[in-house]
Amino acid sequence: NLNNELAEAIALAHDLGHPPFGHTGEDALKQLMAPYGGFDHNAQAIKIVTRLECHYADFDGLNLTWECLEGIAKHNGPIGDKLPFALADYNIEHDLELDTHASAEAQIAALSDDIAYNNHDLHDGIRAGVFLEEELMVLPIVGPAYAEVDEKYPNLEPSRRTHEALRRVFAQMVSDVVLTSKSNL
């Protein structure tokens, strides 16, 4: 059985390490911090949740479980040889087994994050005119989603059409993850 609260805590806490301005801000920080060990948003999240709040005598931070901290650190998978400084310091005291895969809850949080940001990026791209909806119809998940919306709601205003279609894309991605996970277990 999976711990839903753990998956949710990992999903929410890992985002604390993101800098302003999204991926552009992160890329800029990586470049600026390269001489000092670089920048990694998951390592930054660990730093924030383990050091920022200083209210208690026995510990700094949010007093999260080892499993939650491990999931935040391994949001993108095992860390490998190049360990960010923020993680290296914390890992000395609390071995997060960074060379192994994260828990199922952490993997669910990571997949959920991927699904969410990919759908938001798709919506942002459509709104900004980077993607034309007609061009996206050839994509395996997107085309059928729009076709279903057009059949069910033939006179839907464009904005609602987009939202309805992307809602179906989102649901299909979630369904694919669930079905693939079930078949792999």
Residues of each region from the PLM?
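Histidine-centered, transition-metal-coordinating active-site segments
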Residues: 1-5, 42-43, 48-57, 61-185
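Acidic/His-rich, divalent-metal-binding segments that scaffold phosphate/diphosphate chemistry
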Residues: 1-36, 49-57, 82
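Histidine-centered active-site/metal-ligand motif
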Residues: 14, 18, 23, 41, ...
